[in-house]
Design a protein with these regions (language model features):
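Short, well-ordered beta-to-alpha junction loops that form the rim of enzyme active sites
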Residues: 160-163
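Short phosphate/oxyanion-binding micro-motifs
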Residues: 1-152, 156
Length: 164
């Protein structure tokens, strides 16, 4: 999914970029997205990776605060509200968003414009240790595929809940 208007830069020698990760356990509650946006502002975070979003399908939501939530969950709205990842972007960082891809319910990638090199952020939510071996292997194969597709010159940030 590509954003049409060309962005400002996310990262430059003069700007500090603050990135965070939060396993929020669910965003399937009224007002939860607004609460997350307030916490981002409180700590001055520009890009916040979210695990266990528990929203179905994939999409982009702009909040009344100006923050933008990119999310990826199970493909069918009839599925249980489980897993899911997201990236909450500040008003400043959304301007530099070039494109994003909801790879599956556990991996989401976003690419940002920066001063010298583009920045690719990969948000992950790995299966837990008690998950079956096939689920774990599928996750890591998908993650490797995402990293293989990432432009080699990009600054790549892999973050999330790795469930070690």
């Amino acid at each position: 999914m590509t954003q049409r208007n060309l962005p400002t830069t996310l990262l430059s020698p003069k700007n500090v970029l603050r990135i965070g990760v939060w396993n929020i356990r669910t965003m399937y509650q009224t007002g939860r997205a607004a609460q997350v946006a307030r916490e981002m502002d409180r700590y001055g975070i520009h890009v916040l990776g979210l695990s266990e979003v528990r929203w179905t399908t994939a999409g982009k939501v702009t909040l009344s605060s100006g923050h933008t939530l990119l999310f990826s969950g199970p493909p069918d709205e009839g599925d249980a509200h489980r897993n899911g990842v997201g990236l909450m972007l500040s008003r400043q960082s959304v301007k530099s968003l070039m494109e994003w891809e909801p790879d599956n319910e556990r991996i989401l990638t976003a690419r940002f414009k920066s001063k010298f090199q583009e920045v690719t952020v990969v948000q992950c939510y790995a299966p837990t240790n008690v998950a079956d071996q096939e689920s774990k292997e599928d996750f890591y194969e998908c993650l490797q595929g995402v990293l293989d597709r990432t432009p080699k010159r990009d600054i790549t940030i892999v973050m999330g809940n790795m469930n070690a």
